[in-house]
């Protein structure tokens, strides 16, 4: 958000940055559509075209991502297609679709934690991400998937404390 605002208001920064960058990549959380739009507007104003902006979906266990955007016309929430060599499994979970991974970049399990490892994988060896997805366009699966929240809304802080976001709504 800060870089989008700075690129709108700081001509020198915008010119310097966009004269050198050929792609933006971000991860960690989705950007809101107004931020995407602001970044695209700054790019088009300065260099007359959009710089490829990419993201994906992953976690430590998928080292680092499992799904990656390759489409040049990305919108907020788009995740993309599986990385080469990765298999996806889409599982209906009470009205949401969980994405699961199996492939060479997926962890074989948790160190000295056989119970947690067994819980993390399904009977076919797919890692259960807990992430919900939808097709970007159901008529063109080549565009890939978009984020649709979490199957389990609880998450763990770096301190080890679990947080339930349900009551925060």
Label for each model-derived stretch:
Residues 92, 97-157:
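Conserved ATP-binding/catalytic segment of the ANL
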Residues 62, 107, 165:
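Glycine-rich phosphate/pyrophosphate-binding beta-alpha loops
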Residues 1-96:
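Conserved adenylate-forming
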Residues 1-2, 164-169:
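Short, intrinsically disordered, charge-balanced linker/junction segments flanking boundaries
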Residues 35-38, 113, 167:
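Residues at alpha-helix caps and immediate loop-helix transition turns in enzyme cores, especially N-
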């Amino acid at each position: 958000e800060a870089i989008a605002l700075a690129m709108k208001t700081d001509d020198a920064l915008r010119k310097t940055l966009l004269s050198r960058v050929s792609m933006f990549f971000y991860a960690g959380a989705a950007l809101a559509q107004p931020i995407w739009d602001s970044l695209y507007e700054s790019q088009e104003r300065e260099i007359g075209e959009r710089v490829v902006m990419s993201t994906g979906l992953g976690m430590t266990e998928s080292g680092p991502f499992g799904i990656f955007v390759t489409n040049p016309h990305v919108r907020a929430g788009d995740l993309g297609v599986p990385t080469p060599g990765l298999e996806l499994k889409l599982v209906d979970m009470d009205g949401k679709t969980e994405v699961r991974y199996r492939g060479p970049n997926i962890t074989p399990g948790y160190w000295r934690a056989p119970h947690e490892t067994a819980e993390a994988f399904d009977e076919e060896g797919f890692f259960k991400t807990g992430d919900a997805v939808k097709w970007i366009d159901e008529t063109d699966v080549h565009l890939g998937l978009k984020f649709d929240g979490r199957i389990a809304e609880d998450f763990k802080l770096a301190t080890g404390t679990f947080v339930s976001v349900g009551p925060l709504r």
